[in-house]
Each structure stands twice: as C-alpha cells, then as structure tokens.
C-alpha cells in the first residue's frame, strides 16, 4: 500500500475499510489503557481516536480490550507435527499473528528443499511467518544428517527470500563458535553483514565462554533455566526469550528475573509444542496469562509478547497498535483471564468468537504433501553382548532437555545386556535414516516403559530413527512398521501395533488436519500409557538425540558426551 493512500484516511477525507469502535486499547508505548476507535485501511492502521466514526465495515467492540497481535520469538513448526497451514489454523485463535520460525528440523532432513517447502507453504496465509536460516545443518558431526547447509546455500537463500529470512537460526554449536570453526563463523559473518539477527542457543554457558560466544554477534538466548543464568546473559547484552514448550518449560523459574527496569529485553517463545498441548493450553496467549498469574504486570507481559520481540527482530511496523503499523489486532475480554475473542489480520476478522472465520490456504498449490524417504541399514541386530563391565546410561529429567549420565551395573540374561524394567532402564537404538550408514545402541533411564516399544522418526536435530523398548522383538516390529508408513511414530505392545501416527512430510509432519492429528496423537499417548509410562515421555524421547544440549545423548554414531563433544563407549572401566 502506498503512503498517499493511507494519509487521506487518517485525515478523515476517505473511509477506512474497517472501523473498530468502543475499544479499550492497550498502548504498549505508554502503558496506558485508552478508550478509543481504530480506523484500518487494508493491512495498516490508518488512525486511532474517537474522531473516527465511519467505515465500510463497523465493529462495535463493546469495551473489549485491544492488544497487538502476539509474536512467537522462536518456534519450530515441525515440532507440532502439522503442516504449516494447519499450524497456522491452530495458533491464530490463540492470538498469535506473527512467528519467527527456524526450519532446522526439516532442513536437517531435506536441506534447501525443506526450507523452500516451508517458505512456499506459508506464502499468502493470514499469519506473518518469518524465518531464521538454520545455522546447524548438521547440528554436529557426531550424528548423520540428511543434508548439509553451507555458507553458499545461505547466500542463495538470502537472495531468493530477502524479506522472509530475518535471522540466523539458533547457533547451537557453541563449541564451534569458541573454537572459531571456519564454516560457522563464515555463516555468522554473512548474516550480520546483511543486518540480520544472530540467534543463540547456549545452555549453561557463563563467564569467559559466554563473553566469547557473544563476541560472535549472538544476541539472544532461549535456553536459560535459572534466574541467575538469565540475568548474567541479560547483563552482557543478550535478549532473553523465555521458553515454555511441551518438554522444556522455563517460565516459572525465569519470571522472577523480569522487573520494571529490564523487561524490555525479554520475550516469549514456545520453541517446541505438540498440537495437543496447543489445543489444551494455547500458544503465546497461555504464556502471557500464566506470567500474569505469577504476578507479572499485564502491560509488561503483553509487551514481552509483542513490541519487545518486534523491536529485537527489527519488525518496524509490528508489535503495537499505532498509526502506520500492521493491523494485527487481538480483542480480549480482560487483561487477566485473557480470553481471546477476535483476531483481526489485514483488516479482516480471521477469528470470531474464538474460532477461525476464514478459509486459510497457501497461494502455492504445488506444495508436496509427501517428501523424503526413510532408509536404514537392512542387516542389523539389537543384541548387546555382556562384557562384565558397568555401563553408562542416559537419565531423563522431567520438563527439561538436559539429561544426566549415570553409571550402573547392567541386567544380564544369556550373556546379553537387556532392559532393566525394575529399575526403569530400557534399551534404545538410533538408526541413520538418511543414508543407511549404521546405527548405535544404548540404554535410557526415566521413560517409565514397562512393556513394549516406541519408534519415531522425530529426533532433534538430524531426526534419525529411534526405537526404545523392553524387548528386541517389539523394537524390531516398531522399526518395520515405521518403514512401511514412511516415517512417524509407532507404539508396540505384545508384538502388536497398538497405535501409530504417519508423518509423510519428511518423517516430521502430517498431511492431515490438525483435528485429525490431535485425535491420533491422543490415541497414541493413551497407547503409550498402556506401556506403563506417562504420556508426556514422548517429547523427552524426541530430544534424546540432541547432541548439543548436555549431558549425555545418543545418535546413530553412539553415545555422546555433549560437554566434550565426543563419542563415548557404552561400557565403563571402573
């Protein structure tokens, strides 16, 4: 839209497309609540004031509160297991109108092809979808990825999508930064000279190492787990994204770090949320509501979900309800219960009475719904011979991506190490599903599985095929079924498939509606409970391969000592 089109509307000389009257507007700049009217032309707010009283369409808000559209500072769409359009349909009723998505899940499987898919699939939908170019493809060379995204690829992508790509995705390989890895530093230099943000990922980093990491122009972090960690990073100039995902939930521990003086440098993000979690709890709106419930001032909480994030990413016309800004507006009943009733996007109501009121589809009709193929080694054995030594195992921590290393005496039967159900220890195997180069075997504690097996092609970040279970027969059947459905999640009990969710888009996302996926996921989780465990274990399983978050992880190449970035043996000399 041209400037000369909107100025006559602001002056009252021409009629706006939409007039929202009798609204209580939260001004994120002043912190005041203003009883006023809002005049909108096309995708922009033309004017604010009680002097505006005509419009081609007039909506009486009847004293509802108007806040800016909510912004998710860091999200992986793929973690929802939904196609991008279905993901948009889920989060719009929750008031999210803008996301900064890092497509490094699909990029680690399909490379540039995967990034192209995500960008095209979100073109022309009533959701502002910006992308961070994945910095970690692969995240580490201690696993086998489906692709390598080099500096030359980044240059090509920036030339092709200069306005959709606004950052370098989370720099997970912080050892690479500290060791001045040539390829990684080159990527950072390319993006910073294009005036793009460099997003961080540095769990537990502090002191001199944190200083060195920030020296590489890394300006944000979403991995803080404690108040002291957040305040140290904030004090050194980092913008803190408070994460509240499905598996990793840091809101309660980090809200105490926020105060009236420093809150401008905090934002909210979901990072990874599955669709059932979004359906039950919500999206950024849930984080805002919970933060307010913990005593945070509503104005501060809403700033953290809107203008703070927009300012950080240089989204100059977003994050506020002001003249010339994008008409991304959310109407809520009050600032405490935070019930979202209407969402306006580009002068149109996309949500009415809390429900989608607009057909959402991409302008691209040729986006594939099935891409990628699962490919693993054909000849394998899951048996582990006893060597009369102790073994190192992965220990899961609830609601955390951080795992611990434990040294235990294994359970042995017929000279083979087997799952030790009584002590909550089960076998896990990870297969390279991209090149069929091999697999590794380990053991994990804390899943609660007492019978059966679970297999999945979701495994951050290279998303290799992982299977864990109490016995080899069920594990082998789970692998077989995963191959038949070309990726997804399979649950086995007593040598029978009791539930499955097919994910044909790169083995990560479904091509079905979000309602269908939620129903299947609910059935899947109930089936997992039949194995004796709690259903929230699934998201933990999906992060057991993440070899850039401490302490002990497993990839197709073996057990990984994350802090020292090296492969370690299953057996331990004592």
Curated annotation (Swiss-Prot):
Listed GO MF terms: adenine deaminase activity
Domain of life: Bacteria
Keyword Magnesium listed: no
Entry keyword set: Hydrolase, Manganese
Gene3D superfamilies to which the protein is assigned, alphabetical: Metal-dependent hydrolases (3.20.20.140), Urease, subunit C, domain 1 (2.30.40.10)
Cofactor: Mn(2+)
Database matches in InterPro entries: Adenine_deam (IPR006679), Adenine_deam_C (IPR026912), Amidohydro-rel (IPR006680), Metal-dep_hydrolase_composite (IPR011059), Metal_Hydrolase (IPR032466)
Enzyme Commission designation: 3.5.4.2
GO terms under biological process: adenine catabolic process
Reactions performed catalytically: adenine + H2O + H(+) = hypoxanthine + NH4(+)
Annotated family: Belongs to the metallo-dependent hydrolases superfamily. Adenine deaminase family.
UniProt name for this protein: Adenine deaminase
Lineage of the species this protein comes from: Bacteria, Thermotogati, Thermotogota, Thermotogae, Thermotogales
UniProt gene name: ade
């Amino acid at each position: 839209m041209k400037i000369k089109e909107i100025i006559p509307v602001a002056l009252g000389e021409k009629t706006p497309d939409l007039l929202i009257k009798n609204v209580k507007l939260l001004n994120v700049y002043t912190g005041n609540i203003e009883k006023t009217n809002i005049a909108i032309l096309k995708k922009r707010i033309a004017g604010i004031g009680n002097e505006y009283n005509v419009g081609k369409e007039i909506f009486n808000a009847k004293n509802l509160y108007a806040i800016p559209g909510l912004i998710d500072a860091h999200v992986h769409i793929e973690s929802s297991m939904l196609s991008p359009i279905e993901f948009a349909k889920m989060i719009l009723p929750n008031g999210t109108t803008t996301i900064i998505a890092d497509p490094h899940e699909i990029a680690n499987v399909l490379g540039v092809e995967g990034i192209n898919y995500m960008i095209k699939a979100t073109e022309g939908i009533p959701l502002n979808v910006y992308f961070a170019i994945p910095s970690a493809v692969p995240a580490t060379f201690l696993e086998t990825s489906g692709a390598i995204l080099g500096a030359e690829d980044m240059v090509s992508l920036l030339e092709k999508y200069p306005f959709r790509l606004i950052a370098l995705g989370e720099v997970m390989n912080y050892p690479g930064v500290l060791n001045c890895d040539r390829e990684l530093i080159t990527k950072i230099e390319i993006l910073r000279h294009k005036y793009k943000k460099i997003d961080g990922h540095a769990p537990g980093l502090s002191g001199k190492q944190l200083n060195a990491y920030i020296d590489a122009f890394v300006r944000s972090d979403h991995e803080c787990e404690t108040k002291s960690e957040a305040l140290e990073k904030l004090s050194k100039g980092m913008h803190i994204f408070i994460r509240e995902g499905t598996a990793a939930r840091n809101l309660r521990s980090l809200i105490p770090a926020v105060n009236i003086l420093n809150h401008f440098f905090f934002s909210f993000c979901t990072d990874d949320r599955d669709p059932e979690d979004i359906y039950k709890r919500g999206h950024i709106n849930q984080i805002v509501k919970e933060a307010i419930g913990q005593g945070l001032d509503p104005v501060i909480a809403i700033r953290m979900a809107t203008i703070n994030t927009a300012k950080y990413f240089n989204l100059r016309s977003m994050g506020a309800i002001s003249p010339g800004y994008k008409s991304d507006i959310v109407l809520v009943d009050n600032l405490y219960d935070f019930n979202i009733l209407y969402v306006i996007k580009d002068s149109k109501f996309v949500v009415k009475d809390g429900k989608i009121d607009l057909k959402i589809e991409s302008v691209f009709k040729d986006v594939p719904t099935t891409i990628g193929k699962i490919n693993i080694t054909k000849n394998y054995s899951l048996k582990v011979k006893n060597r009369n030594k102790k073994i190192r195992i992965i220990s899961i921590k609830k609601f955390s991506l951080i795992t611990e290393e434990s040294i235990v005496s294994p359970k042995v039967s017929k000279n083979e190490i087997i799952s030790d159900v009584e002590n909550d220890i089960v076998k896990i195997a990870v297969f390279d599903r991209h090149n069929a180069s091999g697999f590794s075997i380990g053991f994990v504690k804390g899943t609660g599985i007492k019978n059966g097996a679970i297999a999945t092609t979701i495994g951050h970040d290279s998303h290799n095929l992982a299977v864990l279970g109490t016995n080899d027969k069920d594990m082998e059947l789970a692998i077989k079924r995963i191959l038949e459905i070309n990726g997804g999640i399979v649950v086995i009990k007593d040598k029978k498939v009791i539930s499955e969710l097919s994910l044909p888009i790169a083995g990560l996302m479904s091509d079905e509606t979000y309602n269908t996926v939620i129903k299947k996921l609910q059935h899947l989780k109930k089936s997992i409970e039949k194995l004796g465990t709690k259903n929230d274990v699934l998201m933990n399983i999906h992060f057991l391969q993440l070899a850039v978050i401490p302490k002990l992880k497993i990839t197709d190449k073996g057990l990984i000592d994350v802090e020292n970035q090296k492969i370690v043996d299953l057996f331990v000399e004592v």
